[in-house]
A protein has these predicted regions:
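Conserved beta-strand-loop surface patch within small alpha/beta domains used
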Residues: 1-68, 77-118
Length: 118
C-alpha cells in the first residue's frame, strides 16, 4: 500500500495538468510506503500516448538512504489503468510501484509491477 499525502498529490496533479495534453512523468520519493515528495521529470517524447522519463540522475541515490522510488506518469484522456504501452515499458521499472494519474477523472491509482502483469 502507498500513502500519498495531499501536498504530494497536489504537486503531481499540477504537473499533469500543466503538461496535458501530453503525458507527464516523474518519481515519488517514499519512506515506509508514505510519499514524502514528488520529483518532476520531463517526458522526452512530449507525447499524449507515451513517455520517456528524463530526470536528474542524482535522485536515484536516495535509495541508498533507505527511500523507495515510485514511477509516476499521467494519462491525459484515459483511466489510470496501465495501457499496453505501459505494460511493454514496465520492464524498465521492475519491482517498483507504478503510479498513474487520470487527468480527466482526477484519479490516482497505484500498481505493482511484476514480470507477468500489473
Amino acid at each position: 500500500m502507498v500513502v500519498i499525502p495531499e501536498n504530494v498529490f497536489a504537486a503531481m496533479r499540477e504537473h499533469a495538468r500543466e503538461e496535458a495534453p501530453n503525458e507527464c512523468c516523474g518519481l515519488v520519493v517514499l519512506r515506509d510506503g508514505v510519499a514524502e515528495r514528488y520529483e518532476r521529470g520531463r517526458n522526452r517524447l512530449a507525447s499524449p500516448y507515451r513517455y520517456e522519463l528524463e530526470i536528474d540522475p542524482e535522485i536515484w541515490f536516495v535509495e541508498d538512504d533507505g527511500y523507495e522510488l515510485a514511477v509516476f506518469h499521467s494519462h491525459p484522456e484515459t483511466e489510470p489503468i496501465p495501457s499496453r504501452t505501459d505494460q511493454e515499458l514496465s520492464g524498465l521499472w521492475g519491482g517498483r510501484t507504478f503510479l498513474i494519474y487520470g487527468v480527466k477523472l482526477d484519479q490516482l491509482r497505484a500498481w505493482q509491477i511484476t514480470r507477468e502483469s500489473f
